[in-house]
């Protein structure tokens, strides 16, 4: 298993897929990185040489925000929204959907398990 910026990527998968195991790198960015470094996208991650792994590490550290830095940035952005009392910040604070989805039904993932309320007495 090659270790890239502190993450073990799967050795048996193709390089394009293996890179997506790093937080902040999806399919499109993986293609972009492979083209920049002129690597073979069909090659397995285990076939990378030490020199290629080194180039990959240096590129990811210098040009991209990934893993811990990206997670911290997302968290700080959410904290900032909450601090300035924006609508999106309030939705985050109340654990409700942020992007305009309906909440009368659905949104169970965001709200959590149902809180049962006693019915009306007759």
Swiss-Prot record:
Return one Gene Ontology term, BP aspect. translation
Q: Which PROSITE patterns match?
A: RIBOSOMAL_S13_1 (PS00646), RIBOSOMAL_S13_2 (PS50159)
Query: Which terms are listed as keywords in the entry?
Result: Ribonucleoprotein, Ribosomal protein, RNA-binding, rRNA-binding, tRNA-binding
Provide the transmembrane region boundaries.
none
* One Pfam family from the record: Ribosomal_S13
For bias type Basic residues, the affected ranges are 101-122
Keyword DNA repair on entry: no
State a GO cellular component annotated for this protein.
small ribosomal subunit
| NCBIfam families with a match to the protein in the record | uS13_bact
- Please give the HAMAP family that the UniProt record associates with this protein: Ribosomal_uS13
Family assignment?
Belongs to the universal ribosomal protein uS13 family.
This chain's function reads: Located at the top of the head of the 30S subunit, it contacts several helices of the 16S rRNA. In the 70S ribosome it contacts the 23S rRNA (bridge B1a) and protein L5 of the 50S subunit (bridge B1b), connecting the 2 subunits; these bridges are implicated in subunit movement. Contacts the tRNAs in the A and P-sites.
Quaternary form? Part of the 30S ribosomal subunit. Forms a loose heterodimer with protein S19. Forms two bridges to the 50S subunit in the 70S ribosome.
Name of the protein in its database record: Small ribosomal subunit protein uS13
Organism equals Chlamydia pneumoniae
């Amino acid at each position: 298993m090659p270790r890239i910026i502190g993450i073990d990527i799967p050795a048996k998968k193709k390089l394009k897929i293996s890179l997506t195991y790093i937080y902040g790198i999806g399919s499109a960015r993986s293609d972009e990185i492979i083209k920049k470094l002129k690597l073979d996208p069909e090659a397995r991650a285990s076939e990378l040489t030490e020199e290629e792994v080194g180039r990959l590490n240096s590129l990811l550290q210098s040009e991209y925000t990934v893993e811990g830095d990206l997670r911290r940035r997302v968290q700080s952005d959410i904290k900032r929204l909450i601090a300035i009392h924006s609508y999106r910040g309030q939705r985050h604070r109340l654990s409700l959907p942020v992007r305009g989805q309906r909440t009368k039904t659905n949104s169970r993932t965001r709200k959590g398990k149902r809180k049962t309320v006693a019915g009306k007495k007759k």
